[in-house]
Amino acid sequence: MCGIVGYVGRRPAYVVVMDALRRMEYRGYDSSGIALVDGGTLTVRRRAGRLANLEEAVAEMPSTALSGTTGLGHTRWATHGRPTDRNAHPHRDAAGKIAVVHNGIIENFAVLRRELETAGVEFASDTDTEVAAHLVARAYRHGETADDFVGSVLAVLRRLEGHFTLVFANADDPGTLVAARRSTPLVLGIGDNEMFVGSDVAAFIEHTREAVELGQDQAVVITADGYRISDFDGNDGLQAGRDFRPFHIDWDLAAAEKGGYEYFMLKEIAEQPAAVADTLLGHFVGGRIVLDEQRLSDQELREIDKVFVVACGTAYHSGLLAKYAIEHWTRLPVEVELASEFRYRDPVLDRSTLVVAISQSGETADTLEAVRHAKEQKAKVLAICNTNGSQIPRECDAVLYTRAGPEIGVASTKTFLAQIAANYLLGLALAQARGTKYPDEVEREYHELEAMPDLVARVIAATGPVAELAHRFAQSSTVLFLGRHVGYPVALEGALKLKELAYMHAEGFAAGELKHGPIALIEDGLPVIVVMPSPKGSATLHAKLLSNIREIQTRGAVTIVIAEEGDETVRPYADHLIEIPAVSTLLQPLLSTIPLQVFAASVARARGYDVDKPRNLAKSVTVE
C-alpha cells in the first residue's frame, strides 16, 4: 500500500526521491513526506493530500538540505492515525536525528508506546511508526549499541511484531541508510556509485535495472559504494539465490509512463492484446503445455482431487472464471474463495488439494496468509502473479506468471485479462497431466487462446460508442449488471470497476437470481448492462437470459446489451447494443470485459474523477 524510497549517492537526493514518489503514486496514498540528510542535519517535510502539496513544501526547503545526497521518501495510506500532516511519514525521534518511513503494521506498538511514554518520551503523532524512531534513538544513545546506528536498528527490529518494511536515516551518519522487511515488499536497486531501496522497482527504474529482492526478516545497510544484507541478528553469511534474489528488471521507464495517453488506465486497456499474447507466449512446447516455474510433477497433478482458488477483488473474479474452465476440462471440483475469508472458515485441505493463489502484486496480505495456511495443511500451492520474484510466488510450489508488464492504474485492467489467460493455461495443464483431454484437444484449445489478442484489439478499437454511452448515464444513481455462466463474473467485474472509478452504486447479479430480489430495484430509466452468452453455446442459457432482458425492459429499465456479432434475437430487446466477435463460451470474457472497462473509465471522467488514482484505494494491499 504505502510507497517507500530511499537513496544514497552522489546527486541531490530530493530530485531522486520526489521522482520516485511520483512513479509510486499508483500504489495509493493520502499523505506524503521526505527526509533529507546533509552535514549532520536532518530536514523533514510532510503534507496530507496530493503529492503536489509536498512539492510546494520541498520548494521552500533550505538550499543546504536540497544539496543533501541521502534521502527518504514515503507515500502513506493511513492505518494508525488520520491522514494529517502530523501523521505523515517520515517520523523522527525527539532530537530530530533519526528518521524512519514504514509500510505495514507494528502489532505490538501499543506496548512499546507505553514503555516509551513511561520513560518520558513525548509522541508527536498517532502512528505506530513513531515508536520505531524513538526506540532506535534510545538504543543509539544508551546501552550496548550506543553510537552504533546499524546495531541499534537491528536491536529494535528484533523487538517488533507484525508485518513491516522500515527504512531508517541518521543525521550523524549521512551516507548510510538501514532498511528491513518482514512480510511486506522491499527491493534494492544497484546503481553506479549510488544505491536505492523501494517498495517496488518503480522507485528506481529510471536509474537502474539491476535489483535485489530481500528475503524474510532481512536487513540491508546501503551506502553509495554498496550494500550488506544480514538477518535481524546481524548475521551476514547469506547467499544470493538462496536467501535473497538478485534479478534484472525486464521492463523500462517507458512502460511506466503514459506514452501519449490521457491516463494510465486508457493506455493499459490498449495494452491488453499484448498482455494476453505475452502471457501465453512460450507455454506450448513440443506439443505440451508448460508452466513457468513448474515444481509440481505430472504425477502430483494427477493426484489432485480438489482445487481451491483464493484471491481478492478483480483477481477473485478471474478465479470465478477459472472454476468454469478447470471443472469443464478436468472434471475436478473447484471452489473459489475470497482470500480474506479462506483461512477463517477452516477449509478442508490435504496433500491432494491444489490451492491456486492469484495476486497481481504477489504481496497481497490476505492472499499471502491464505497461501501460508494452505501450506500448513500440506496442500500444494500454485501462484498466478504479475510480479516476478515477489513473496507469494516464492512461497508456492509452482508459479504461472502473467506477463502484463507494470500496471500503474489502481483499477486492474490488463492484469485481469492476463489472469484469465493464465487460469486457462493452468486448466489445460491439469487436463493434460490427468488425461482428461487428448493432446490434439489441448493443442486446439491453446491455439484458440493464441488467436484472442487480435480479437481483443478489435474490441478495443470499436469502443468509441461505449464511451459516448457512458456520458449519457454518467449521472445515474445506480447501474445493475447481469450475466449467466461465464457472464456472471464479468458482470461482477463490471460493477466493481464502476464502483472503484466512478463512486457509483453498482451491483452485479447472476441473472437467474433476478426474481429472488434484485428485480425489486428495477424502475423506469434504470440502466442495466447485460452480458449475453453466445447463441451457439447453450440454447437454454441464451433463451433464459433473453427472457430476463424482456422482464427488466417491461419494467422500464434501459437495457445495454453486450452480445455476439450476428445475434439478431437480442436486438429487439436491447436499447443499446454492443457487439463483440463470436468466440467459444469460455473465451468470451476476454472480450466482453473490455466494454465494461471503457464504460467505467468514461463515466468516471464524465463525473470529473481521477481514473488512475480513485479515492481510498491502493494498488497493492499489503496489510490485512
UniProtKB/Swiss-Prot annotation:
GO terms for molecular function: carbohydrate derivative binding; glutamine-fructose-6-phosphate transaminase (isomerizing) activity. Keywords: Aminotransferase, Cytoplasm, Glutamine amidotransferase, Repeat, Transferase. InterPro entries: GATase_2_dom, GFAT, GFAT_N, GlmS/AgaS_SIS, GlmS/FrlB_SIS, Ntn_hydrolases_N, SIS_dom, SIS_dom_sf. Residues 297-436, 469-614 form the SIS domain. The active site is at C2, K619. Transmembrane segments: none annotated. GO terms for cellular component: cytosol; plasma membrane. SUPFAM superfamilies: N-terminal nucleophile aminohydrolases (Ntn hydrolases), SIS domain. Residues 2-225 form the Glutamine amidotransferase type-2 domain. It comes from the Bacteria. It catalyses: D-fructose 6-phosphate + L-glutamine = D-glucosamine 6-phosphate + L-glutamate. One of its GO terms (biological process) is carbohydrate metabolic process. The keyword rRNA-binding does not apply. Its EC number is 2.6.1.16. It is found in: Cytoplasm. Catalyzes the first step in hexosamine metabolism, converting fructose-6P into glucosamine-6P using glutamine as a nitrogen source. Homodimer. This is Glutamine--fructose-6-phosphate aminotransferase [isomerizing]. It comes from Mycobacterium tuberculosis (strain ATCC 25618 / H37Rv). The gene is glmS.
